[in-house]
């Protein structure tokens, strides 16, 4: 089995959060390390605010509960809150938590201003990596907004999108394969695996990329 270094960066674009994956990055690159540090600094404050918001909804001690699921407190996320809420009986599963409490616009959601798309792509590229838009099917953009996102991403030096991912349905595999063809993107796969039972698919069960698309990792492996 072969491995690549990687990073996933949260980005604010058109008032929504998207994720940009960097593959084959140099983890010691100064620009990347400093950029990630700035991004992490806002994560803890947001998590505390989410805990306060959930308390107003009758879910006390959520921040402390979420921390029990975190190996690195600097990396606390909504998923850790979701695990606490499922374990504590407030929801049936992680998706139920996001649908009812923590998804965009839901009563426990707290917005955060993440990095700019241009900054994230720059950090990835100067560290020797290639930028990939992660699981585009998760983002609630209009077709016009998606076209603008993809065009800007290309202008900034972005190379690929995730086509086959645990966050996509089979119909979305086909949809984003067509996007890759239309924009000339290379393609990537990602399980988006966080824990057993939390996603649509388990590790090792994703189908391959369509044979006519170029895998982004071919240049390294």
Which residues are covered by each model-predicted region?
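Exposed alpha-helical structural elements
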Residues: 31, 65, 80, 96-97, ...
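Divalent metal-binding pocket/active-site signature
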Residues: 44-52, 57-144
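Charged catalytic cores and adjacent phosphate/nucleic-acid-binding surfaces used
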Residues: 1-28, 36-39, 92, 115-133, ...
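Mid-domain alpha/beta scaffold segments of enzyme catalytic cores
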Residues: 1-45, 49-71, 75-80
